[in-house]
Amino acid sequence: MKFIDELDIERVNQVLNFETIDCKIVGGCDIFTTKAVASDRKLYKTIDHHLDTILQDNESYNLALQQQIALDAEDKNERSMSPGGQRRDSSSFWEQKRRMSVSDSPIYLQHINGNLNESNGAQGEIVADLVPPIIKTSKLNDHNLKELVSNYEAGYSSSSSVESLTHKNKERRTSSLSSTGGKVDKLRADSSTANDITARSVLNDTSRTLNLGPFGPINEPSSRRTFAYLIAILNASYPDHDFSLLEPTDFKRSSIKSFIAKFENSMYSLGRKPEEWIWEVINSHMTLSDCVLYQYCPTQSFLDDEPGHLWSLIGFFFNKKRKRVAYVYLLASRLQLAVNNAIGTPDEMQNEDGTFRNNNTTSFDNNNTQFEGEYDLTYEENAIVDDDDEE
């Protein structure tokens, strides 16, 4: 990538470099073209290999997850089709069947029969035979069954009709329950199959279009190239560091307005009033309305290892139409550390023989002769005393 040197951009960099009472601020705007050079092509190959490794790891993870889903589905099918499960279903069915209400001994409407016999004579007996019995409900047990059969054999109704009626009711209930159970099993099987198909399709789609970070699918060349542009700019700005192993998730996409607001708020907190002409100059070279902003926000920044580092704000304005990337940054570090470095470290203040150098010395220039002396404020008896001091 080629660095673009502009005079008005240099003015922006001068304004963004200053010191406060306790901080040193290093800011600026560097503009690069996306035209690749020989070193960039080598970097692009390294980044492609790194992203291919990430993609392979993701595919292996998806394959293991798909196998686990298939095993879980097989376990569910085995549990639903196991004999123990069927016995449990049948036992629960007969338990419900046992608790169902059945007909007790049939009782005719005697008062109705009596009234009919008194009024109609022989016709009352015929009507009485046609009146259905009132059924008293109770739980099914052996005593009720014997009583029911004996009563019907005595003349209330034929045992064959009772058996046929009971058999029909039993078949109807059994068929309804079996059909309901079959529908439930079919729905469960269909739902499990649909879930498996959905999970597999999602996994396949994920493996084909894996989105890591704000750049889109990493298997597409355009997404990889955009990610490589930012890595190349960081390598050019900080040659002592290697950023080729950064992850796409170390960046995030944000709006340009929010980034400008953060930038100006940081300037306000540092006691500087933001200048509107700064963004006008950047806009003249980048056309911010056509730009996409990627903000560098890793979990652990390389600047954390720098001595005295406090915070940083780094953004990349990418204009695909103009084939340019603007690197806008604002870095803050402690100023006290710079003052201590100016004074000197203990190693720098030590002489060759191991003794420490005394910096409280003065030099006098008298006829091109260097005289070096020290201030000694201790009192000695042999010291020379002026006459004025004795008086």
UniProtKB/Swiss-Prot annotation:
GO terms for cellular component: cytoplasm; nucleolus. Keywords: Nucleus, Repressor, Transcription, Transcription regulation. Its main location: nucleus. Disulfide bonds: none annotated. Residues 86-96, 165-174 have a biased composition (Basic and acidic residues). InterPro entries: Maf1, Maf1_sf. Pfam families: Maf1 (PF09174). The keyword Transcription applies. The keyword Transcription applies. Residues 75-96, 159-189, 348-368 are annotated as: Disordered. One of its GO terms (biological process) is negative regulation of transcription by RNA polymerase III. GO terms for molecular function: RNA polymerase III core binding. Residues 356-368 have a biased composition (Low complexity). It comes from the Eukaryota. It is found in: Nucleus. Belongs to the MAF1 family. PANTHER family: REPRESSOR OF RNA POLYMERASE III TRANSCRIPTION MAF1 (PTHR22504), REPRESSOR OF RNA POLYMERASE III TRANSCRIPTION MAF1 HOMOLOG (PTHR22504:SF0). Mediator of diverse signals that repress RNA polymerase III transcription. Inhibits the de novo assembly of TFIIIB onto DNA. This is Repressor of RNA polymerase III transcription MAF1. It comes from Candida glabrata (strain ATCC 2001 / BCRC 20586 / JCM 3761 / NBRC 0622 / NRRL Y-65 / CBS 138).
